[in-house]
Curated annotation (Swiss-Prot):
UniProt cross-references to InterPro entries, sorted A to Z: Astacin-like_dom, CUB_dom, MetalloPept_cat_dom_sf, Metallopeptidase_nem, Peptidase_M12A, Peptidase_Metallo, Sperma_CUB_dom_sf, TSP1_rpt
Entry cofactors: Zn(2+)
Any Pfam family matching the protein: TSP_1
Protein name: Zinc metalloproteinase nas-36
Binding residue positions for Zn(2+): H219, H223, H229
Deletion consequences: Worms exhibit a trail of old cuticle that remains attached to the posterior part of the body.
Organ and tissue specificity: Expressed in hypodermal cells. Also detected in the hypodermal seam cells in L4 larvae and young adults. In old adult hermaphrodites, it localizes to the vulva (at protein level).
Domain EGF-like: start-end pairs: 317-358
PROSITE patterns, alphabetized: ASTACIN, CUB, EGF_1, TSP1, ZINC_PROTEASE
Amino acid sequence: MRLCHSIILFNSLISISICSKADDPALLVASEFKEHFNVEEKQLETVEELLIKMKKLAHSRSFKGREFGHDAVEDSKKEVAISTQQGTINKKVSPFLFEGDIFLSRRQAVDILKALSKDKTKRLRRSFVSDKTATWKTMPIKYRFHESIDFYTISQIIAAIRFWEDSTCITFENVSDSPDGDYIEFFSGQGCYSMIGRNGGRQGISIGESCVKMGVIEHEIGHALGLWHEQSRPDALGYVTIERDFILPSYISDFLQRDDEIDTLGIPYDLGSVMHYGSTAFSVDQKSKTVVTRDSLYQQTIGQREKLSFYDVATINTAYCKDECKSEKTKCENGGYMRPSKCSECLCPDGLGGEKCEKNEDSKNAECGGIIKLTEEWKEIESPNYPDPGYEADQKCSWLLKAEKGKRVEIEFIEDFSFLCTSTCVDFVELKISDDLRNTGFRFCCYDKPEISFVSQTDTAIIIFRSQLSTDIGFKIQAKSTDAEPRTTIAPTIITTTLAPITVDAPNVWADWGEWSMCSRTCGGCGIRSRVRSCRSKKCEGRRQEFGTCNLKACPVDKHCAKLLSNNRLCNGKVCTKNDIAISSCDAPQCCPPFINVDGVCQSDQENQHDELWLSI
């Protein structure tokens, strides 16, 4: 790497800077990697070159005949993220990162590229790193804080480390100076990123300004312990579909099916994993869904960054802690198991608590929850202070529902329903009604009340209420024992069928427009829908994707909005971290600006905007 040198001409007192590529932001970022990771400049350049080869190979297979360079330049102008809960990926470091937040070793990059080159039809089998040399052999794992980390970030990192320590057999030790051997260095870098597994010597974890959230920090530590992203597992396509037409073309390599020998360790797929992509990962507009759950009830579950899920922890415990607690005889119920850090205690699935996971989890900042024994008569359950003044931020409740012997639990949502609206639920009610109470359930938020009736697979169900950021009405549910057959899902979400890539020699040849996506909001002209078309020639002029307004019927009167409410329904899929407080007018059905209510239909006096508002990318 060439540097800037200052030459002082003493006779004229003129300072001239002779600068080369050291002023290049990419090279300045490269110095960040060299400072915080055990990596030489040549190795860093090799990893970058391998990542470019992966991108070009994946791009050529998906968009045959199109120019990768042109797409890469256009994509570099846009913001990208792997989850709306994790912040956007810093453009300076993205050339060095795989799947948005993974800094690969040279060996890992070579292995992935080889797998891609050999067989394009198979999937890289990943959940936990299979390379045994990449696991941490010596405990405690030493770590230090770089001088760039501020006090608040340090407190969040310590909290995340303690969660890992409490839930697993892994231990950590903070050291002030750089020790000999292997260690982790937390630093405030250009975004959130980490390496996969132990790589030897100094190994950085970047916790940038947009990453200071416990779930994000736990995610990056998870990578360092050996966890890949959840949707990279070999069984992922049984639970999600990848909508290629909505992915930024030069990032298609972060979704392709590949093949390698990396183990899932027998842990079930978890749509609520903190390691899972969000629904708009690498999206062309940060709104269109690129990851669609086959069961649409899970759509707003994926991408959470609140905390590790039960199965996230179980993966690490299976990899590192199998020999712990062998001599203990603690018995745990409902899918719980002995806590490796303290074998006399049970580690319980979310929503469960007690000494043996036999009861509901303790509530937080509210008097709520409990064990409810059901009969054939309906019993009602509601969130704290429902409906007025409604729930508050940072509350949690859980209810353990038990049907009569030989029967199941039936659940229906009734009356008003309203939560902070985000693409990944931050405030939500969760239903765990499958026969696996360990796995994450359906999470519901926003203000569209689920209209179907749910029936559990067994005689047990769990309801969890969680609020993190906002205040709102909440929910009311009625539940009873039933002989009905299980109803735990609805038809899969279907968006667009992708055509096989075909390239023709003629210029500017577009395929037909695909189907419209679902509207992002249900009323008031508040949402958008989109559709895409593929370029069949090497290059096309015109828009690839177009957007339109939708659901122009005015939103119904909300009888509870006479109080102060946050305008969280206009977040456009992003987390409302700041509440815009206003007194809502509640005497008539509502429309979102610039629309106004005209006889129950949202219209605008701007030309053509009352019908379809077109945008393009």
